[in-house]
């Protein structure tokens, strides 16, 4: 059966080829093409370090796109992006961190897995300087991921040079809008992933709906391909000692996969995201590991009493861990349905989990 392109009249086909050639001469190869002729229709992704979140995102953070991660203070925003940086570095990629808040802890970044010796870092004085650095890094096509921490700290030069208390209406919003227009095209061409961390503010006088909003105006919301809302939902304890938090991430916007999915995972103090915790949760949901009462079993053999002991068993047996992870990934690739809308939802607490 002839395709639609074959059915085009010869004179139209000739005129079309002529104008396509002219456009490519003027603007470069790839400036315009048939969608089916694109070399890569499938968007490549970067792992977040949390298998549950990768699943909710449809594979991970998309390359060559703008991503916004927002949430309350100490919810895990920086930890999540440091894990993404570590994953890029494991693949031989180059990462940059624009530390507008001047708060990056190199010791913690190392504990998460970041190679700080090869991490590019900038601590800009103004918002204009920060975004110009981002634009130049993106246009170089030599950097694979750039993280900006945070939008709220991108203070316009006019505000810094002005007096305390001066009314500076909409300066940051205009700055972000101009930056988005400038860098978005370059991001797509270079394949660089740009992640903006953002803070929450309260809207005054809101009676209905959520009073929460993000800083920096509306531009980032429109230009971002993925928006992640991360919240701390639980404090993890062993007895009375706190050792981490449980985080919940909602995919508020996703242009490359179905949105509104939710993922949960543990963040351990001083260590970052618990990758083994994510693996145990998904192994249970996909049926690779079964749970009866407090006991977790694999192929009929008990491997741990309680979730924490099961995680320890996987940590002590790397070959077994690799087998479980392979089976989980195979089931997820085949479209296995998880038991809940929330990916990696924490199981009900058992007596063993409570005592440990």
UniProtKB/Swiss-Prot annotation:
Its main location: cytoplasm. GO terms for cellular component: cytosol. It is found in: Cytoplasm. The keyword DNA-binding applies. It holds the Pfam family RecA_C. GO terms for molecular function: ATP binding; ATP hydrolysis activity; ATP-dependent DNA damage sensor activity; damaged DNA binding; single-stranded DNA binding. The keyword ATP-binding applies. One of its GO terms (biological process) is DNA repair. InterPro entries: AAA+_ATPase, DNA_recomb/repair_RecA, DNA_recomb/repair_RecA_CS, P-loop_NTPase, RecA-like_C, RecA-like_N, RecA_ATP-bd, RecA_C_sf. Keywords: ATP-binding, Cytoplasm, DNA damage, DNA recombination, DNA repair, DNA-binding, Nucleotide-binding, SOS response. ATP binds at residues 71-78. Belongs to the RecA family. PANTHER family: MITOCHONDRIAL DNA REPAIR PROTEIN RECA HOMOLOG-RELATED (PTHR45900:SF1), RECA (PTHR45900). Can catalyze the hydrolysis of ATP in the presence of single-stranded DNA, the ATP-dependent uptake of single-stranded DNA by duplex DNA, and the ATP-dependent hybridization of homologous single-stranded DNAs. It interacts with LexA causing its activation and leading to its autocatalytic cleavage. NCBIfam families: tigrfam_recA (TIGR02012). HAMAP family: RecA. This is Protein RecA. It comes from Synechococcus elongatus (strain ATCC 33912 / PCC 7942 / FACHB-805) (Anacystis nidulans R2). The gene is recA.
């Amino acid at each position: 059966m002839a395709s639609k392109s074959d059915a085009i009249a010869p004179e139209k086909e000739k005129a079309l080829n002529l104008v396509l050639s002219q456009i490519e001469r003027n603007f470069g190869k790839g400036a315009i093409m048939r969608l089916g002729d694109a070399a890569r229709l499938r968007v490549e992704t970067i792992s977040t370090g949390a298998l549950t979140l990768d699943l909710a995102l449809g594979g991970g953070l998309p390359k060559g796109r703008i991503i916004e991660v927002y949430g309350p203070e100490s919810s895990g925003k920086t930890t999540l992006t440091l894990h993404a940086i570590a994953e890029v570095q494991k693949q031989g990629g180059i990462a940059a961190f624009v530390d507008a808040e001047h708060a990056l802890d190199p010791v913690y970044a190392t504990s998460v897995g970041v190679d700080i010796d090869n991490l590019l870092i900038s601590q800009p004085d103004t918002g204009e300087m920060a975004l110009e650095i981002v634009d130049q890094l993106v246009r170089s096509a030599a950097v694979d991921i750039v993280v900006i921490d945070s939008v709220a700290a991108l203070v316009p030069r006019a505000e810094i040079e002005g007096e305390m208390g001066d009314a500076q209406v909409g300066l940051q919003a205009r700055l972000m809008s101009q930056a988005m227009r400038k860098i978005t095209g370059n991001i797509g061409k270079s394949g660089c992933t740009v992640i903006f961390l953002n803070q929450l503010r309260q809207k005054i006088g809101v009676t209905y709906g959520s009073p929460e909003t993000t800083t920096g105006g509306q531009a980032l919301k429109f230009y971002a391909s993925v928006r992640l809302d991360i919240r701390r939902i639980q404090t993890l304890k062993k007895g009375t000692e706190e050792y981490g938090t449980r985080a919940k991430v909602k995919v508020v916007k996703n242009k490359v996969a179905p949105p509104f999915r939710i993922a949960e995972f543990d963040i351990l103090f001083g260590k970052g995201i618990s990758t083994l915790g994510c693996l145990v949760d998904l192994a249970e949901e996909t049926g690779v590991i079964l749970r009866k009462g407090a006991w977790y079993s694999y192929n009929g053999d008990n491997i741990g009493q309680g979730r924490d002991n099961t995680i320890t068993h996987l940590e002590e047996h790397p070959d077994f861990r690799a087998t479980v992870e392979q089976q989980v990934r195979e089931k997820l690739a085949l479209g296995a349905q998880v038991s809940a809308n929330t990916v990696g939802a924490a199981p009900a607490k058992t007596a063993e989990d409570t005592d440990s």
